[in-house]
UniProtKB/Swiss-Prot annotation:
The keyword Oxidoreductase belongs to this UniProt entry's keyword annotation: no
GO term, biological process aspect, one: DNA catabolic process
Protein name per UniProt: Exodeoxyribonuclease 7 large subunit
Stated family: Belongs to the XseA family.
Swiss-Prot/TrEMBL keywords: Cytoplasm, Exonuclease, Hydrolase, Nuclease
Gene name in the database record: xseA
Gene Ontology cellular component annotations, sorted alphabetically: cytoplasm; exodeoxyribonuclease VII complex
Single GO term (MF): nucleic acid binding
EC number: 3.1.11.6
Reactions catalysed according to its record: Exonucleolytic cleavage in either 5'- to 3'- or 3'- to 5'-direction to yield nucleoside 5'-phosphates
Organism encoding this protein: Rickettsia bellii (strain OSU 85-389)
Leading EC class: hydrolase
Subunit text: Heterooligomer composed of large and small subunits.
Length: 442
């Protein structure tokens, strides 16, 4: 009994606060920053905004505290039964003599939990309209292509090699992490960064790329911040995440989805050789059509010349008829008056009073003369009207008006029309609307 009493006298004595603090220091100093996987149970969110729950595995339980600022950064709702991976620090709570994990980061664990979170997030963002935007067209020949991906690995090399192979152009690389807790934010910041560049340095299209992997590996590309940055980008975005069977939320918000990073490079630029071949085909069609058009217009000019000659002959003929009619009218008037005077003299002075017959015949003659003059005027007006119509038609068909529209007439020294580049004429006279020029062939 004395020994025991002596021993108790030499043992260090602690207050409750002291021993609690010692345990707290022991936990924090020996474990530091750790990761723990388990299932959420007993979740409670206090009015202060802090979350309290247990992380359990079979019969083992670890108390967890998630402070409000950390809880606000978690991008999916917490539920009992959800399997998660928590990063944080172990500590103790002196109020009830228990240790707990202070949460600093929380991610879903297990395929089922991740699929559930993904479906809920997809439905919510789709309801907001983030997947129903009007897709921006991918430029046909971009001067600069922005690539957001990891600077290491085969993806960036595949993209650069494919672009150089098809149509070499300037590539701007924005290196990011494509996996991990903060990679979604990094990629979103890269998209925003490209959009904030000056116009002279801004790419015409952005490729966001990553190689294949599991749903956990590609989880960053389901990040809500990244989806919103993709939706808000003023620059067209091609998403190229994983393989053809892999789909992430960025694919739904991008302007075009490529099944692989190599395919994204193919979407971004055409093949130069094919483009050159297409241009040559277009050139041939253009030359052929132009030659046919020139030939058709040359024939039209020839037809216009024939019509002009016919119209000139027709108008001259009608003018001659008009002149002859006018002369006949003028010549017939004195004869008519003379005839009437002769008839008047033949009447017997005993049967008709001279004064009355003269008055009557004068009146009759006046009416007839007026009628003849009126008929002559109407005939003249009719011919003048027809002459004006024919003149307008002739003017519209005049080849000078054709020259006004940008055509030219080419003649050789012999005066013959030249319609082919194979002519043997050495000196060409080219007639434009406002004058002629002479050209000498080499």
């Amino acid at each position: 009994m004395l020994d025991n009493f002596t021993s108790s006298q030499t043992t260090k004595e602690f207050s409750v606060s002291e021993i609690s603090n010692k345990i707290k220091e022991l936990l924090e100093n020996n474990f530091g920053y750790i990761k723990v996987k388990g299932e959420i149970s007993g979740l409670k969110i206090a009015s202060s905004g802090h979350a309290y729950f247990n992380l359990k595995e079979n019969t083992a339980i670890l108390a967890c505290t998630c402070w409000r600022p950390i809880l606000a950064k978690i991008k999916f709702p917490l539920n009992d039964g959800m399997e998660v991976v928590i990063s944080g620090k172990l500590s103790s709570y002196a109020g009830n003599s228990r240790y707990q994990l202070s949460v600093e980061n929380l991610q879903p664990a297990g395929l089922g939990a991740m699929v559930q979170i993904l479906n809920e997030r997809k439905a919510r963002l789709e309801k907001e309209g983030l997947f129903n935007k009007i897709r921006k067209p991918i430029p046909f020949l971009p001067n600069k292509i922005g690539v957001i991906t990891s600077i290491t690995g085969a993806v960036i090399q595949d993209i650069i090699h494919r672009i150089r192979e098809r149509f070499p152009t300037h590539v701007i690389i924005w290196p990011v992490s494509v996996q991990g807790e903060n990679s979604g934010n990094e990629i979103a910041e890269a998209i925003d960064g490209f959009n904030k560049l000056e116009e002279a340095n801004k790419p015409d299209v952005i490729i966001v790329a990553r190689g294949g992997g599991s749903i956990e590996d590609l989880w960053s590309f389901n990040d809500e911040v990244l989806v919103r940055a993709t939706y808000n980008s003023k620059i067209p975005i091609i998403s190229a995440v994983g393989h053809e069977v892999d789909y992430t939320l960025i694919d739904l918000a991008a302007d075009k989805r490529a099944p692989t990073p190599t395919a994204a490079a193919e979407f971004a630029v055409p093949v130069r050789s094919i483009l050159n071949s297409t241009l040559q085909s277009y050139e041939k069609v253009l030359v052929t059509n132009t030659k046919q058009l020139v030939k058709n217009h040359e024939q039209a000019i020839t037809n216009y010349d024939k019509i002009n000659r016919y119209l000139a002959h027709y108008i001259n003929h009608k003018q001659q008829l008009l002149d002859e009619t006018g002369f006949n009218l003028l010549d017939s008037l004195p004869c008519l008056i003379s005839l009437k005077e002769t008839k008047l003299k033949s009447f017997s002075k005993e049967r008709i009073h001279p004064h009355k017959i003269i008055t009557y015949k004068t009146l009759e003659l006046t009416h007839k003369a007026a009628y003849i003059i009126k008929s002559a005027n109407n005939t003249l007006k009719n011919f003048e009207y027809k002459l004006e119509l024919n003149s307008l038609l002739l003017l519209s068909l005049d080849y000078h008006n054709v020259l006004k529209r940008g055509f030219a007439i080419v003649k050789g020294e012999s005066g013959n029309f030249v319609s082919s580049k194979t002519t043997t004429e050495k000196v060409l006279n080219i007639q434009f609307f406002d004058g002629n020029i002479k050209a000498v062939r080499d």
